[in-house]
């Protein structure tokens, strides 16, 4: 199994949970904020999905495409589905050698990193915010929540 397939499985083990949590956010709760300084549920979900896609585009040395014209008019489930599929395609496009390529992220985070580290940074970011998302959906009243990660 190539590095791309291994990473894709790791990505999906977390992203499938993220998408399940996003699916629990009803239209009436998209503007929910646990505190006045918190991101809204919609903003948090979009931030997670788009950031991972952008980091993966950089790691795959491909131009980031604007996937939606009107984010606020797109359902969270559609955002999750499209960003997940596009991120999967980028991961699948990478060869084992691509994982070692140096990616210049000086404008974004001030350094250059191997592509594999860029992907791991994206995963750390997703895991961090997935914890936030668990809190949001709990506070929306949901008690039937998925495990932190799902294999298979």
What is the meaning of each model-derived region?
Residues 28-29, 97:
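Secondary-structure boundary/capping positions in well-ordered alpha/beta enzyme cores
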Residues 94-109:
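Acidic catalytic patch
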Residues 1-12, 78:
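Extreme N-terminal tail/first-helix region
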Residues 2, 75, 117-118:
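A ubiquitous short alpha-helical element
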Residues 57-95:
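Helix-adjacent hinge/juxtasegments
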Residues 8, 12, 16-19, 29-69, ...:
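Short, contiguous alpha-helical
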């Amino acid at each position: 199994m190539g590095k791309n397939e291994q990473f894709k499985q790791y990505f999906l083990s977390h992203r499938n949970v993220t998408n399940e949590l996003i699916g629990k956010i009803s239209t009436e709760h998209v503007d929910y904020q646990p505190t006045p300084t918190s991101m809204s549920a919609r903003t948090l979900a979009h931030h997670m999905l788009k950031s991972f896609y952008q980091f993966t585009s950089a790691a795959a040395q491909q131009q980031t495409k604007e996937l939606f014209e009107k984010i606020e008019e797109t359902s969270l489930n559609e955002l999750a589905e499209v960003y997940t599929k596009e991120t999967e395609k980028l991961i699948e496009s990478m060869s084992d050698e691509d994982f070692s390529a140096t990616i210049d992220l000086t404008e974004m985070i001030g350094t250059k990193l191997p592509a594999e580290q860029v992907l791991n940074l994206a995963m750390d970011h997703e895991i961090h915010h997935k914890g936030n998302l668990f809190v949001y959906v709990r506070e929306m009243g949901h008690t039937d929540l998925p495990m932190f990660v799902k294999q298979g």
